[in-house]
Amino acid sequence: TQDRSSAASDVYKRQDFLLSNLNGTNKISNKDLEGDYILNVWASWCITCMVEHPYLSKLSKNGIKIVGLNYKDDRSDALVWLNKFDNPYDLIIHDFKGTLALDLGVTGAPETFLVNNGKVVAHYQGEVNQTVWNEVFQPIINSKNLSLK
């Protein structure tokens, strides 16, 4: 586990982007992402993403706001994957070339960021599960009194 939240937060704070949603029907910019939320980097080709997916679905069903960043993935493969395994994301950004992910310092999938009003306050590389949630994310959510709903 690595926490590069300080470096990533600076980049994320000033990073303007305009990418399409996963369906290709709308454009999404940094201005569309407000408040507190989880940003999860995932791909249909990522085995570990499949392992963590049920936990993300559980978080989503509990009202946690999750934005998906679909990373270097084929749009149709990703849509099929979500139809098969459930869609826990409130919004999905399709980052086919990986440009936004690169700007965030992403080295692979899955990676998960906790975002507080446009600033990354936590960054986890690897599978998010109950233990990671309790040890990495929940203490920050509690200390900053974040509302992820």
Briefly describe each language-model feature range:
Residues M50-F85, F96-L102:
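Structural microenvironment flanking redox-active thiols in thiol-disulfide oxidoreductases
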Residues T1-A8, Y12:
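Single conserved hydrophobic/aromatic residue that forms the stacking wall/gate
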Residues K84-P88, D95-I141:
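Thiol/disulfide oxidoreductase modules built on the thioredoxin-like
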Residues L18-K27, L91-D95:
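Short gly/ser/thr-rich secondary-structure transition/capping motifs
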Residues I38-L39, I66, T112:
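Hydrophobic beta-strand anchors of alpha/beta hydrolase catalytic cores
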Residues L146-K149:
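Non-globular targeting/processing and membrane-anchoring segments
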Residues I28-M50:
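Short active-site neighborhood of thiol/selenol oxidoreductases, capturing the structured segment around
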